[in-house]
Amino acid sequence: EKGRENLLLQSNQFDTTWGLEATTLTSGQTGYDGSSDAWKVIPITDNSTHYVYKTTPYQTGVSTFSVYAKYSGYHAQLRVFNIGGGKAYANFDLQNGTKGTSGGTDIIDSTITSVGNGWYRITLSLNYTIAPYSSGVIPIESPTDGEIPSYAGDGTSGVLIQDFQHEVGLVATGYIETTTAAVQKGILENLPRIDYSGGASCPSLLLEPQRTNLF
């Protein structure tokens, strides 16, 4: 298995170290995986911008952000931003499973994939060029809305979200849950495989001398 890592902490605990802007959260929603681990992000009735966000670690090069989302009165915008402006955003139509408006100075691509029962995995890929960044989900009224729109919510409708991930690379891989630290799976780059036993009771490295046949 190729090495993978979710760099975003508290990846499905949006009531911990995540920031809320003019929104409320309701936990215990039915998730894409049949669990009750999804969250409903509900815009409040103030005429404002509404989103849930988190600062992400700096990684030079290409990064991909992903989250599972479902329509519950609003569509979704994935956004990655820095002090002074957005770096990438993409809108997603959660009723029809299509991409909407997107933009930003560092955007590469976005995708939406159905996972059943009205749930979609939405992704946003971009070039990391400056630190620090924040990433988040914004409930939007229309897939054609601009970046981080302002409006007054009804206090009831929202968007369901579950399992946020930030990883290095252009493709969103299988979700890895995190709490207070990043979590790695598979064989990571620049790390040796320590899985040779040779009769030993614990994993070890097999080292052999290099030989050359001169005939």
Name what the model sees in each region.
Residues 1-215:
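Extracellular and organelle-lumenal recognition/adhesion modules and their flexible linkers in secreted
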